[in-house]
Amino acid sequence: MKSKKKRTKHLKSISAWVVSADMGYGHQRAVFPLKDISEEGIITAGKNDGSSAKGKKSWKRLLNVYESFSRARGIPWVGKPIFAIFDTLMHIPEFYPIRNLSRSTYQVDLLDRNIKNGLCNGMMEKISTKQLPLVTSFYAPAIAADMHGYEPVFCIICDADINRVWVAKQPWESRIN
């Protein structure tokens, strides 16, 4: 087993842009073990990623929508129907029978439009200053980087099942690992 000193020295030679999002704790937890290789520390999309005021507002709005729907279930009378809408949007089809699930969805098109309108631009400007691998635990930064032609991009899947929105609009053209 390598000594801690040798391991630490080796880690100093490895560097990557490490990006997360405040969409539940799972995304932050997934990148925490990578803090020692993160260039400029762990970047949180919409917070310390170089986003403009407009970009930060977009991320805040997304977080508010996510949290509102996630917590809606606890509201008497209307909570369950509101959560059902959210659950429908986040529906993950059964794996079997195996079939082609690459068709774009409403969420994929919405993400595509948001990225084209500037979502993740601050992050892209920041990571473009130094060509390092991008490792992210949230799909939006990975897909934005892929759309901008940035390489290499690695996306950590935090859940056992993933929604179609975690995959590029044209998955066969994507370079995300």
Predicted segments — roles?
Residues 32-125:
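Conserved N-terminal ligand/cofactor-binding loop architecture of enzyme catalytic domains
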